[in-house]
Amino acid sequence: MIRVRAVLPPEWPLWRTLRLQALADAPYAFGSRLSEWQGDGDAEWRWRDRLQSVAFNAVAEVRGTPAGMVSGADGGGEAPKEAELLSLWVAPWARGRGVGDALVETVLAWAASRARDTVSLSVREQNRPAIALYRRHGFVDVGPDGGEESPELRERRMVRSLHDR
């Protein structure tokens, strides 16, 4: 059984464990590096700040074992009716069990509860499993995100309307 629940700043050790696992397992999928969150970067205040500065953070558990994570951020400035799906990761042992689907659905529900019109995300072009996951949930590729020349770092922007389904 998959359970997805919000994570609050006092649970920073859980978020830390999952985030470090994610950065070690899939460094190509994130904007930060494992080394940036280790050593001097591995401080309680920093983990708490990460959880406080992003509007929504959640973990997925399979039979009580942490299996994945995701965040949701409010759009701002030019996109106040948009939310953004960030930092989705599923532990290798939990892939193919619906954990990614549950995490995406949780962010979509969170965004709808905040009266957002769309949810957007950025995904590395080479991350085919993630792109397939997002397409299953109605996300559409709207083009390149940024001007990165290096093929392994190129990202695509995907958007999902919350009014289409």
Residue ranges and their predicted role:
Residues 91-93, 97, 125-126:
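Active-site acidic-Proline motif in GNAT/NAT acetyltransferases
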Residues 1-4:
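Extreme N-terminal starter segment of soluble prokaryotic enzymes
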Residues 96-97, 102, 108, 112-113, ...:
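Charged, amphipathic alpha-helical coiled-coil/dimerization segments
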Residues 117-131, 136-165:
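C-terminal "cap" of GNAT-fold acetyltransferases
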